[in-house]
């Protein structure tokens, strides 16, 4: 599959198609389907659930189930945080009422492999529903597949062609066989990785000696070969789902500042080998009682090399070299029992046990001379257990309540250059209320305690030689805690239209950010308490009534404001790596008679800052444009072209000579003109 490392990705604007069909979703229950252009009808018994049948997506002529899900109004797919464990770390996509058997085989990946003609209907579940595991999300989709027998192959070819940088090519082949409740598939993939922020520019450094203006250029690309096998079928009165995958992946990047005799060059290469096995078994144990068990194991071996060399007046300085080699793994055992006590009340309880490990050896040299790093060679292990209970109660057709409690205990042990052992215990309550006072109006409230998971790589040293920065490891990390209060109002109109406004406040305990270490180094660590306030707005306007047939207008943005006390200066500042704003404005259209869709999305402003003890690094982008056109001459063939334009990307770095006084040693301004690139994709089903 194709992986794209986009600075603009957080906007989630990779458009799979264009406007909605001029129909409204059909409700669950024995109600008549709505006429074209009418507002969606709610299930008379459960107003938080809307059902979208294939007719709703007909004008789009979707290729895959993911194309259909991407067009569900009011929903944005999320594959989860990828954090350790299963509970609270997976996505908001269910297939036949359950999540995929593996964490790495994300919901969007499964749907992208599922042909659209295999979808019976899609349920949009807002605020919870009996028998549905929301996993902390306010909104999820449940894709229900058709039964029957079939054999199908899907082949894809894709390319990313850059104006002056490294081009990449990939493709995949999948065979799927289905016979009633039993199915199996094989996927062979030659994937690609790219970055949209590379290109030429200028790098200007200002210090006490004056101004140095130099040329700048960079590039980054990668790919991977993988094979995956999936199976699903009945077993011993229940259903078994299994998946296994093995892959080889690589990433290359380089950066040049200056030219000729005055040149700073850095590069980075990473090679990984990874695999996983996932098993899910679901079985009724008595009327209204269901047992669900999961076993997941995944592993990775990695080898990384980063180098840097500065040449001044034709004389090379001491070469920098940072290497990291190691392995990581995760094993999860999870079981729960679900009791559908009544049609309005579902209770479930269970537990999860997980073991995680990272074993890495790292080294840093300058001119061939080893430089000692804190926690350069470490092994980090975590044994974590969690017990949970939750319930969903549909008080009446207009009101649904969901509540639960998770009790987590974990022990993290570190050995190697530094030894440490810490144990943690946290109670994580959750409450959500969903009120639908009348059709097309919904109010959702959520209160929850979330616990962030520690990134094992933060326990070990690391380097970013493109800006001459080396980080030490930190053995004293503790999880970040958030008390979240969130209120969302949703209003649907014109059948496919929606306006959603949400406000969220996080009280953050033990914020994880950059902190100072002795010896002039810095590391990732806990820097104190902080807050986040977020205003979210999501708008979809169908344009048929405005004489733009098959068209729609979209707007989506999160405005974030964060506060934390800087551990170096003692002053209030934003939390690192949180984007204050990133509006996504788009127009798309289906032209059925031409069997074509087109669209354009614009991000007027994006960016974020990283605040360290010795430097502040901020990047800003403006005027990011992505446009596409997709032609489907037959139901089994699609041709898609996408153009990405971005000519305004700047990085500002302020470096200090003294942590206490914050005296500026120099500033660096990098103005990059990211290269334009075209993405091509051909998909054929046979």
Residue spans of the language-model regions?
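Face-selective signature of the C-terminal outer-membrane beta-barrel domain
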Residues: 228-249, 268-420, 436, 501, ...
